[in-house]
Structure formats: C-alpha cells, structure tokens
Curated annotation (Swiss-Prot):
Gene: gatC
Reaction catalyzed: L-glutamyl-tRNA(Gln) + L-glutamine + ATP + H2O = L-glutaminyl-tRNA(Gln) + L-glutamate + ADP + phosphate + H(+); L-aspartyl-tRNA(Asn) + L-glutamine + ATP + H2O = L-asparaginyl-tRNA(Asn) + L-glutamate + ADP + phosphate + 2 H(+)
Top EC class for this record: ligase
Keywords from the UniProt entry: ATP-binding, Ligase, Nucleotide-binding, Protein biosynthesis
Protein name, UniProt field: Aspartyl/glutamyl-tRNA(Asn/Gln) amidotransferase subunit C
Pfam family, one: GatC
Amino acid sequence: MSHISADDVRKVAQLARLDLPDDSIATFTPQLERILDFVAQLEAIDTEGLPPTTRAVEVVNVTREDGVEPTPVREELLNQAPQREGDFFRVPRILNN
C-alpha cells in the first residue's frame, strides 16, 4: 500500500492548480493512496507480447454523405446583422492593438 502524506496531497493539488482547503486533505489522502495502489496493480500486469490498443472495442465513424445544400443569399444574411460595413459584419473590438 502506498503511503501518502498531507504534504503530498498539497503538492499534487498545487501542481493541478487546485485550491484545496486544509479540511479536505484528510478526505483526499486515502483516495490518492487507493489510486496509486491501483496504478501499481496495473504496472504489475505482464503485457509483453500483447499488441498495443487504443480502445477496447473498435470504433467506426458513422458520417453522412456530403451534399450541396442551398444557402441564403449573402445580401439577406448581411441585412440581418446588427451592424455591417460593406460586405462585412461589423463586430465590437475585443482586443486592443
């Protein structure tokens, strides 16, 4: 069994950029120990000779056929904009220089 200290939990929280209150340390310490014990079990499994896999079940993408669909006339779209400038939508500036 792994031994995790309160300082270890604080360090992991800091590395993960989590604001972990001190009263939560006691809750997360045994949980982190169990996670590390499980990882140790996984590391002990002999995978020599097994082909690498990325998922347990092979997945096939199901996509629709591409097709041409009618689109609104550009002028109709531009006329619906709150503001426009010529053939462009005018939007508020969000970045300075």
